[in-house]
């Protein structure tokens, strides 16, 4: 198995596995060039955050404070807003040939969310040909966070 990841959006851009004839085939949906990921908005393979899924009417209340987020999906906030993590550049550190750590720092108020936050995504290719993804977030004040990966398998 071969996995290709870009730091633009923390995206898995290809997963090559052998087919029944031993030919390597890509099994994730995506584009052929980084320029396509930049110019054609999509979530293909991306790390989604600060908050994956929809937030109703782009509003939430935390510790008695109401927050209004951008409404980018039929009146709701989807996947962290129009400039969510999927459109950000992560710092990348190759820990070893099987492990990559991606880090993104979002400032207080980015896309309307409270708190400075440092998010880490550890992607590991396991010995049994699985991709293990672990998420970690540290913040300096109460906030909401719900990260995921948006790879679509063929």
Protein language model annotation of sequence segments:
Residues 1-154:
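Surface-exposed acidic/polar loop and edge beta-strand patches at domain peripheries
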